[in-house]
Amino acid sequence: MRSTLVFGLFWSGVSAIWPLPVTYSSGNEVLWIDHNVKITYNGAENSTHGYGPENSWTSKIVTNAIERTFDTLFNKNIIPWKFHPRMSNFEPALTSSSQYVTSITLYQTGPDPADIMKPVTGSVDESYNLSMQATGEVTITAPTSIGLLYGLTSFTQLFFKSSGGGVYSPLAPVEITDSPKFPWRGLNVDTSRTFKPMSDMYAMIDSLSYNKMNRLHWHSTDAQAWPLEIPSMPELADKGAYASFQKYSPADVQALQEYGAMLGVEVVVEIDNPGHSSSIWFSYPDLIAAFNVQPNWDDYAAEPPSGTLKLNSTAVYDFLDQLFDDLLPRLKPLTSYFHLGGDEVNANAYTLDDTVRSNSSAVLQPLLQKYMDRNMKQLESAGFIPLVWEEMLLDWNLTLPSNTIVQTWLSDQSVASTVAKGHYALAGNYEFWYLDCGQGQWLDFYPGQSSEEYWPYADYCSPKKNWRLMYSYDPLSGVPENATHLVLGGETHIWSEQTDPINLDHMVWPRACAAGEVLWSGAKDAQGQNRSQITASPRLNEMRERLVARGIRADAVQMPYCTQNSTADGGTSNGNPMCAL
């Protein structure tokens, strides 16, 4: 059970350690920090680099973490005026007698596991302890380089920029002990329906890491477009991408994986199949059944264009063999997982499949079992742990390898049903953690019956999932105590029918932070109660400001009237929050 925090309140401000640590205590002494602070890593002095073997992943992770810490403190910090009463003189004075951080000691208690750059869930101890003395000594202790990364991340959240110059913390002394509730804390990003430039993908990874989230689920292909280059099958992207400049090269994929590995974020690629695969038609039309049926596409697919890989085709099997033989070895050095998709398989589409000609589950289920068995065997041969969407297990009742991770999305019951069958589960109920909901329909409707039926044109998962709703979601809801170990964590999802690079940041941040805290800290407090919005809101407001300082166009949480009149416990000078009911 996670412990409560002991907050050191100062002025009307708040120390926004996000996500919430296991234990945290602070004081009200001021410490300044400058670029020349001495840093040691297990005794090896250097301000930014040079730790351990030059090419080791441990060295890369620690070096990058230190450089990122300095960049955050001195280039991407915030002046916290929004968190103090209006027109107040809240900034400390910098004088010749001001106390500075004198040293930062990073102590790793043991060697990193061999798979630190592509960890199997739970194999990396992500815990850390942080101590910052009022006399200026800072010590961060962790069993792994990732723990040190997270400790340094929390360290940056203790400091603010002064409008007069300099960087300070008003919180010394500080003591933190911390570790995650769940080992899988992810975001699913769809790059098929709208393309996301590499700069946006890097920014997503950076923001995930800053929130101590550790998985980027890359939904790389879908019905609408195939932007992923496969060198042995060049026409897939040459014909399946929206445009020649909207493709991901093998070098892009590797670079994204490497960037994630240095920040503790494992990139997990998904090729959705057999459904959601219509974009293959543009290069291999003979492999796709029920392609772009009009006008009644909705009889054959969840959204246009309809189409599915044929289910009983040797040509499809050959295609998948070649695809995986090309892709999997390139992914393997930097991930232990591969997502095979499997959601929203439409039985009616197979009435138009010349290798099946049926929508009967009695016919389709054994064919789908055979289809998935082949995919699973190829993943096993390549050394991957498979993921699938819940429909493969719960709707089609497929027999899956025991190490398969089942990604749920339809209900809390889906999580409970998955673990009841003995499988690992990822939570992510669309009624709580779908970030794209609430924008209204993206389909157009003909005048008359169609328009009247769908008026006022809400989308299927409206309303928008406010951060407070996301924060209330418990991944363990309905799961028996003796099966909670099978819930590895979860993901929040940004599908992209109406999300492109212009609004991507707004759609994801800071609401994904709420999911991140649930996954790191747990949905319940030490007393077993739902965590309070009142105490979370000031911290989330500050995290939003820190994301903006990092170049993320995150949506506002509250107006300054609210943030200027609250404290770390959500109250004001008279004990009552100003913006609460």
What are these regions (language model features)?
Residues 298-301, 305-404, 409-419:
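Active-site neighborhood of glycoside hydrolase catalytic domains
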Residues 31-33, 37-41, 185-188, 217-219, ...:
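Structural recognition of the beta-strand scaffold that forms the well-ordered cores
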Residues 12-183, 380, 386-393, 400, ...:
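Acidic, contiguous N-terminal accessory segments
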